[in-house]
């Protein structure tokens, strides 16, 4: 049963379904900063495609889920290395280490 809260809902199914229907960048920006559900924040960030915002959320979102998923979108080797070495959450550090290895292979022309 839907609560009618849309992207403000704590229910991930409801929140994400609402974000899928939104295209307005200003609304997506608001969702990225205000949604209580990490999956809604993550999807809003992906839909906006702003690498600077993704980098900011990869470093500072309160949810390891968002940080882990945003680090996978980053292309800045130094930033990804910093997150791999310093994030408080092991899963975020592991995700950053995997992304770092991928970026290093790509920069060496192995992919």
What kind of feature is each model-predicted range?
Residues 1-111:
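Alpha-helical scaffold segments
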């Amino acid at each position: 049963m839907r609560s009618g809260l849309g992207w403000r809902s704590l229910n991930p199914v409801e929140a994400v379904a609402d974000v899928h229907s939104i295209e307005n960048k200003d609304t997506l920006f608001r969702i990225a900063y205000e949604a209580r559900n990490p999956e809604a924040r993550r999807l809003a960030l992906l839909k906006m495609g702003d690498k600077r915002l993704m980098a900011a959320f990869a470093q500072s979102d309160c949810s390891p889920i968002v940080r882990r998923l945003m680090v996978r979108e980053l292309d800045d080797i130094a930033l990804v290395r910093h997150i791999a070495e310093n994030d408080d959450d092991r899963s975020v550090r592991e995700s950053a280490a995997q992304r770092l290895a991928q970026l290093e292979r790509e920069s060496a022309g192995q992919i």
